[in-house]
Amino acid sequence: MSSVRALLAPVLAAVQVALGRLTTSISMKENISKLRAYKWSRVDRFKYGAMFVLAFFSITVISEPPLPWKLIVPILYTLALLFPISSQFILPSSPILLWLLLFYACRFISPSTRPHIWVSVLPTLETIWYGANISDILTRFGHPLLDILAWIPYGVIHFVAPFVVAALLFVYAPPGTVKVFASTFGFTNLVGVLVQIAFPSSPPWYELREGITPANYSMRGSPAGLARIDALFHGHGYTIGFTNAPVVFGAFPSLHAATATCEALFMSYFFPIKAKVGRWYVDTRILYWCY
């Protein structure tokens, strides 16, 4: 028991120090004074201007929930920025919140204004680069053990890792690191969604199911191999989630790859810890496995 306490003592001390850096002020005057004193650079004007345009576009396009209910989102966001106790979390997370807002709004963009869906580009590039259709080859042999091995990083760690990485950076990395991570994480995914809107491309499951027949925006998504996980655990979570996904034709760029890369880079930079496994040296870049 004493050994456990000895191990937890430095962790609890680090958490206590990190929590001590947080503000508990609820004074709106404090944030308003900071805003008035802030000197806006050209980069700030461009960044927040572009974010405002994208947020305005998203709120305008969204039809469910309708007016006035959808205005609750910007109202709550504005109120959260006014109080120091909440703005210290909301402001750095703004790129992430904007990415999620735009991602949700994609389902409401009129198909008549959207570009052509590219069905054969990615399979062709895959064949050129790898000499074969890797997606097709990987689906020829299946086993529940392989499904679980693929599901853990793709369907579980992918959604949990950002919070774990942010918590570790908050406790052990220099002050302000989490803000940089949140901005990088959010803008990376935000740019990814913008590319997906401008260059919609079909995912591997589409070729396996539909071939290279032309796609349209009325088609619904598919859980692909994750449907076997639903069947294995007698659930419907992945089937419902991916079938109703706002972005169906967003195979490029892969947001799974984006988040895994972002997490691996931050972790390997701030925690350059290596472990020897046989002849191999493994460090925190193994998070890229989440892709």
Which stretches of residues belong to each language-model region?
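Interfacial segments of alpha-helical transmembrane regions
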Residues: S93, P162-F199, W205-A215, G278
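Membrane-interfacial catalytic/cofactor-binding modules of polytopic membrane enzymes
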Residues: I197-F271
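Aromatic-anchored segments of alpha-helical transmembrane domains
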Residues: V53-T60, L81, L101-A105, N189-L194, ...
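Membrane-water interface signatures at transmembrane helix termini and the short loops
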Residues: L255, C262-F270, K274-Y291
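Divalent metal-coordination and catalytic microenvironments
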Residues: C106, H158, F181, P200, ...
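N-terminal transmembrane-helix/juxtamembrane module of multi-pass inner/ER membrane proteins
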Residues: S2-V73, F83-F163
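Structural signal for the C-terminal ends of transmembrane alpha-helices
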Residues: I62, L79-S87, L168-P175, M267-P272
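Membrane-water interface at transmembrane helix exits
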Residues: F103, R107, P111, F170, ...
